[in-house]
Swiss-Prot record:
Signal peptide: none
Protein location: Cytoplasm
Stated family: Belongs to the RNase HII family.
Source lineage: Bacteria, Pseudomonadati, Pseudomonadota, Gammaproteobacteria, Pasteurellales
Name of the protein described by the UniProt record: Ribonuclease HII
Taxonomic superkingdom: Bacteria
Cofactor note: Manganese or magnesium. Binds 1 divalent metal ion per monomer in the absence of substrate. May bind a second metal ion after substrate binding.
Species, as recorded: Haemophilus influenzae (strain PittEE)
């Protein structure tokens, strides 16, 4: 059972989505929930159906005291690596909140630097901390929508299906069609495709 840090009124949860994909930004969200307006059914976004995620995302946006998205683009990921880019995007999400939290709970085992707010990393936080679950849902919905937009631009890559993850289909398309400007050049399968073309 997770124990919340004592003596802090406004607690934000932060999570990222999109460390593994070969394309696009890593997207993060920060959420401060309203203790007087609870949301039923919050869970790790990966364990929810798309329909449930979308419904919960709307409810979170409506009921949360504050929420914000952050991101780090593919070229930033290539420049500073995916871990540093994820942490940078988390800081951006927290700094974009319209209400600044007193404490931040971060999914995983690392705390972003430059937060300037007391923080704690929570391993598997997206499953055990409501604020982090809410953040994971908002980040996942936002990133999936971006992949659906990219799919409209480049339907031959089937981004709506694999969401940019290195599935067999995506790797086949990469080998056949080459990399797009949105692909992460520092990731091995993309590097390989760039060498072939």
């Amino acid at each position: 059972m997770f124990e919340y840090p004592q003596g802090y009124k406004l607690i934000a949860g932060v999570d990222e989505v999109g460390r593994g994909p070969l394309v696009g930004a890593v997207v993060t969200a920060a959420v401060i929930l309203d203790p007087h307006n609870p949301i039923e059914g919050l869970a790790d976004s990966k364990k929810l159906s798309e329909k449930k995620r979308l419904a919960l995302a709307d409810e979170i946006k409506e009921k949360a005291l504050a929420w914000a998205l952050g991101r780090a683009e593919a070229d930033e990921i290539d420049e500073i690596n995916i871990l540093q880019a994820s942490l940078l995007a988390m800081t951006r999400a927290v700094k974009s909140l319209k209400i600044q939290p007193h404490f931040v709970l971060v999914d995983g085992n690392k705390i972003p630097k430059d937060l300037d707010i007391p923080a704690q990393a929570v391993v598997k936080g997206d499953s055990i901390v409501a604020e982090i679950s809410a953040a994971s849902i908002l980040a996942k919905v936002a990133r999936d929508q971006e992949m659906e937009e990219l799919d409209k631009q480049y339907p031959e890559y089937a981004f709506a299906k694999h969401k940019g993850y290195p599935t067999k289909l995506h790797l086949e398309k990469l080998a056949e069609l080459g990399a797009l400007p949105q692909h992460r050049r520092s990731f091995a399968p993309v590097k390989k495709a760039l060498e072939q073309f």
